[in-house]
Amino acid sequence: MAKITKVSPLAPAAFPTLPVIDGVRLASIAAGVRYQGRTDVMLAVLDPGTSVAGVFTRSATRSAPVLDCQAKIGGASDGPAAILVNSGNSNAFTGHYGQTSVAEVTQAVADVTGVPVGRVFTSSTGVIGEPMKHERIVAKLGDLNAALSPDALEDAARAIMTTDTFAKGASRTVGIDGKMVKIAGIAKGSGMIAPDMATMLVYIFTDARVEQGALQAMLSAMTDKTFNCITVDSDTSTSDTLLLCATGASGVDAEGNAEFAAALEAVMLDLAQQVVRDGEGATKFVEIRVTGAANDVDAKVHGLAIANSPLVKTAIAGEDPNWGRVVMAIGKSGAAADRDLLSISFGDILVAEKGWVSPNYREEDAAAYMKGQDLVIGVDLGLGAGKSTVWTCDLTHGYIEINADYRS
């Protein structure tokens, strides 16, 4: 597998300080699933009564762990729960062996932790189509269980990385009825990132109390505005998993609370944008704001057409203000557009309007703007009130180098 030695230029300065979430204990270990000399398995054990919600890839070739999680989400929440994650092998496209592997791992986790097997959730990320050496994971479960700690989120974030160049974490606190509620999450993702999730694993924990059905509804709605609005390379993974766990340890009922919902969405968006900032080979972070569409759905379609266009993304990598490629992407999207109503801007620079280049446009200003690391492309379709924002990165030689060497 490609060895990543250089941290993304778009990375945060440091991993954030995350609060301890009462009711959550974690541990990480090196099991040698694929990598040598680094941790590659994470275990989280959650107190009895924890609600667990999840969203997953819509890929038709979903991995065995995803299928198992989907079957379990929505079950009883009275007992403890556990999450086991490995990196290096996705356990996808592995036939009956993959299902057997998941069954043996989940049963082993249940035996070691005392968690009911129906409340053991697993995720795997890495190479597709190679049998999982799950016996290596099983052999480490006793050590993992013994090492569980409430203050181990950063170690967990590092254990689940594949081609990531930095560990990803985010948190928020919110006051509800005079008490503080904490939310903290970790994520991995760098390539094979596109809406309908990505090659992306995300685990978010809160000490708020939220019933499972309400937690699921909240997560599903917020995913559409966060993780389903990012793309690195337009490829949808077999393994995407986002689990949201509410332990209730704070004693605060957050169901229906607007401040809690806003804080949760902020954590999700923070993690989603970090995934884009770690896009394989990325040197620029790009926000695409679409307004004036016939409706919000059309706006998102246009935004993703721009964000996924190799021609747009390579122009951005080359710092070329090639607005013609944005016009091309809008025209091919399939959503409603009128050439003569269209306006395009790069940052605050109006590039094109009314079907033609803006009379005040100066190429040198746009070229200077494109040299920045954080860019905004604005599109106003002039058709209605629909709007959407999506996030992507540029497409560089680095992306090719990483993926050409992925399995070596």
Curated annotation (Swiss-Prot):
It is found in: Cytoplasm. Its main location: cytoplasm. One of its GO terms (molecular function) is L-glutamate N-acetyltransferase activity. Substrate binds at T162, K188, T199, E280, N403, S408. The keyword Cytoplasm applies. Keywords: Acyltransferase, Amino-acid biosynthesis, Arginine biosynthesis, Autocatalytic cleavage, Cytoplasm, Multifunctional enzyme, Transferase. Pathway: Amino-acid biosynthesis; L-arginine biosynthesis; L-ornithine and N-acetyl-L-glutamate from L-glutamate and N(2)-acetyl-L-ornithine (cyclic): step 1/1; Amino-acid biosynthesis; L-arginine biosynthesis; N(2)-acetyl-L-ornithine from L-glutamate: step 1/4. Pfam families: ArgJ (PF01960). InterPro entries: Arg_biosynth_ArgJ, ArgJ-like_dom_sf, ArgJ_beta_C. SUPFAM superfamilies: DmpA/ArgJ-like. Heterotetramer of two alpha and two beta chains. Belongs to the ArgJ family. This is Arginine biosynthesis bifunctional protein ArgJ. It comes from Ruegeria pomeroyi (strain ATCC 700808 / DSM 15171 / DSS-3) (Silicibacter pomeroyi). The gene is argJ.
